[in-house]
Amino acid sequence: HVRNHFGSKPHKCGKCNYSCVNKSMLNSHMKSHTNVYQYRCADCTYATKYCHSLKL
């Protein structure tokens, strides 16, 4: 938590200039570099990389 106050972002993406405070944020960001859409709507053909995109 303290890193948030000092601006330290030790976790860096190897594919772009993104950096963040914790590893879980980096893991989520790395999905943006893939073509995998693992979350699918049960009612239509919509698919997304992020599960929160399916929630109302």
From Swiss-Prot:
Compartments reported by the entry: Nucleus
Presence of the UniProt keyword DNA-binding in the record: yes
Domain of life of the source: Eukaryota
Family of this protein: Belongs to the hunchback C2H2-type zinc-finger protein family.
Organism: Bithynia tentaculata
Name by which UniProt lists this protein: Protein hunchback
Function: Gap class segmentation protein that controls development of head structures.
Example of a GO cellular component annotation carried by this entry: nucleus
Gene Ontology molecular function, alphabetical: DNA binding; zinc ion binding
This protein's UniProt keywords: Developmental protein, DNA-binding, Gap protein, Metal-binding, Nucleus, Repeat, Zinc, Zinc-finger
ZnF endpoints (C2H2-type): 1-5, 11-33, 39-56
Biological-process GO terms, alphabetical: regulation of gene expression; segmentation
Family annotation (Pfam families): zf-C2H2_16
Keyword Metal-binding: yes
